Amino acid sequence: LGVLATANQSLMLNLRREMSIWNINSFGEFFLQILGKYEKAYAQAMDAFREERSRFVKALENISYLRVIPSEANYVLCEVKEHFTARELAVRLLREYGILIKDCSQKCKGNYIRLAVRDTNDNNQLLKALREL
């Protein structure tokens, strides 16, 4: 399962000529066969994830030195506004709490961290650590 996008018409013609009609591997075929079986469980898991993500983001918004950047991803990007640099915060969380977060200051050209949205217990541990700092 995948996508190829190109403006090169010659390349597209050559690929179409060589590609079988059913361009899918055995894993993809198996996945499509069982997809319906797990549709309800997947929908329930996604609902639970969205609910936990919303709760986590609201709690992060109450931490004075963070500014949450709105998104719909499975992580939360935050600007570290005061007290620490992104790197300092990442190092302290790792050293003092054993929690690993992503320091995005090099890639984002600013003082940013990326926090994974995990389960309620893990998210609560991170929130507790952020509040204590």
Stretches found by the model and what they are:
Residues 19-20, 24, 82, 105, ...:
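Structured beta->alpha junctions
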Residues 49-54, 60-96, 113, 117:
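Conserved PLP-binding catalytic core of the aspartate aminotransferase-like
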Residues 23-25, 74, 123:
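Asparagine-centered polar/low-complexity signal
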Residues 1-62, 67-69:
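PLP-dependent aminotransferase class I/II
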Residues 7-8, 37, 81, 118-120:
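Residue-level recognition of strand-loop junctions within catalytic nucleotide-signaling folds
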Residues 95-96, 101, 106-133:
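PLP-dependent enzyme catalytic core of the Aspartate aminotransferase-like
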